[in-house]
């Protein structure tokens, strides 16, 4: 239920730790997936950037995740450079597809974890639509 591209995999730049934790969450909810590659270049919001109307459920999951991170950046608890969502470490557990964020409620770490958890669960429910992989961004993401 995810988009996968193996082309250019060797060119993936090092990712912030939170991105790696997010990928672990996706692996938990979608066993056998390749999270560093999945969801890249799918729709208008999965991958870098994002604009226009999401083209499907998976793309809506990505947009909601982007929006969640944008809200975190506005949160005073997460305003320092060490607390921005892309680098903030958090703690979570995975048991048979069930994700639990374990940092204290209300902390920046917990807020970031909750965003990633919600997105990972959303991805697990989103059907894969090949037609939305590597779409023409200029014409379909208005």
UniProtKB/Swiss-Prot annotation:
Give UniProt keywords alphabetically. Calcium, Disulfide bond, Hydrolase, Lipid degradation, Lipid metabolism, Metal-binding, Secreted, Signal
The record's remark on the cofactor is: Binds 1 Ca(2+) ion.
Alphabetical GO biological process terms: arachidonate secretion; lipid catabolic process; phospholipid metabolic process
Propeptide residues, per UniProt? 10-17
Q: Which reaction does it catalyse?
A: a 1,2-diacyl-sn-glycero-3-phosphocholine + H2O = a 1-acyl-sn-glycero-3-phosphocholine + a fatty acid + H(+)
- Task performed by this protein: PLA2 catalyzes the calcium-dependent hydrolysis of the 2-acyl groups in 3-sn-phosphoglycerides.
Sorted alphabetically, the Gene Ontology cellular component annotations on this record are: extracellular region
Q: Where does Ca(2+) bind?
A: 45, 47, 49, 66
**Pfam families tied to this protein:** Phospholip_A2_1
EC category: hydrolase
Q: Does the keyword Glycosyltransferase apply?
A: no
- UniProt-listed SMART domains: PA2c
Which CDD domains does the UniProt entry name for this protein? Answer: PLA2c
Tissue specificity comment:
Expressed by the venom gland.
Instruction: Identify the main location.
Output: secreted
Q: What is the lineage of its organism?
A: Eukaryota, Metazoa, Chordata, Craniata, Vertebrata
- Could you tell me what this protein is called? Acidic phospholipase A2 Bc-PL
| Native source organism of the sequence | Bungarus candidus
- Active site per UniProt: 65, 116
Q: Which residues form the signal peptide?
A: 1-9
